[in-house]
């Protein structure tokens, strides 16, 4: 059997199951050990029975809606290969834009914290590009912390990873805190594509009734973990900007940047640390239990 025939059969199957072609191509490339750009040039390749058996098992999982990154066990982010697994969020392409914004603002030998680090994608991408930076990462999920440590070892990048709720308690002030927190509301969560809702961890996606529980904690608590003039860099939901800017302004944060992702959706905010202290609202135990993402 040739790859072209397999591809045609698989295309028919995914169309019948409303699976995007991009997911199929990702899984094909990984299964047959080639880059995405190679697929169209290797369609005449003959396939052996053992690889066909492996492919058929993988295709069954894809047709059940499982993300191709979980099937292959890896995802590409900022040109690096990361291990991924169910229980830890798959890094998204739009988050690469957040990394770019951090790199543009990072001075030499600064101390950076990536809250809600998940697989470690943001923290490790920053360290890969800026070896002079001291990078810390944190996550409430022990599974995420274990995976992030594996990725750091595989990529031979030296970062410190903490299992904690947002902020490590034993570290000095950070020059920059970056976070892609959970920001899906309860209502939005029910409308998510089943490939996300049924397979990726709810703990990494949901953030209370309005999707802003984590944002509130970051806005209220981050100042005590930043150096004077320190930056808070956030990824957020496309309808949340006004609410986040409003709560940040009420706490004295200075808005330094507001930007969109490559699809033109409002996605990024950067604030500088308030000059004065504001009252921090109490955080419930329920809120404290949600500090996890990828």
Where are these regions (language model features)?
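Residue-level signal for inorganic ion chemistry
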Residues: 27, 65, 95, 122, ...
């Amino acid at each position: 059997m040739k790859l072209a025939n397999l591809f045609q059969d698989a295309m028919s199957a995914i169309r019948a199951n409303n699976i995007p072609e991009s997911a199929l191509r990702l899984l094909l490339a990984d299964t047959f050990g080639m880059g995405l750009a190679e697929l169209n040039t290797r369609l005449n390749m003959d396939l052996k029975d053992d690889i066909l058996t492996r492919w058929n098992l993988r295709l069954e999982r894809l047709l059940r809606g499982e993300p191709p990154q979980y099937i292959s066990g890896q995802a590409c982010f900022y040109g690096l290969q990361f291990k991924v697994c169910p229980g830890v969020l798959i890094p998204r392409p739009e988050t690469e834009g957040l990394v770019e914004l951090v790199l543009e603002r990072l001075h030499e030998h600064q101390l950076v914290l990536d809250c809600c680090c998940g697989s470690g994608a943001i923290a490790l991408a920053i360290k890969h590009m800026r070896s002079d930076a001291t990078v810390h990462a944190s996550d409430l999920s022990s599974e995420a912390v274990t995976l992030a440590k594996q990725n750091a070892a595989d990529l031979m990048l030296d970062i410190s990873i903490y299992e904690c709720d947002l902020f490590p308690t034993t570290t000095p002030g950070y020059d920059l805190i970056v976070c892609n927190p959970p920001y899906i509301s309860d209502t939005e969560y029910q409308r998510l594509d089943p490939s996300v809702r049924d397979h990726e961890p709810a703990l990494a996606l949901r953030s209370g009734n309005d999707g802003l529980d984590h944002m509130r904690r970051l806005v209220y608590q981050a100042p005590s973990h930043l150096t004077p003039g320190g930056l808070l860099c956030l990824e957020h939901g496309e309808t949340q900007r006004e609410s986040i800017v409003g709560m940040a302004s009420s706490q004295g944060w200075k808005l330094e940047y507001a930007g969109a992702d490559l699809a033109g959706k409002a996605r990024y905010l950067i604030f500088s640390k308030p000059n004065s202290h504001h009252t921090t609202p109490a955080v419930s135990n329920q809120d404290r239990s949600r500090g996890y993402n990828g």
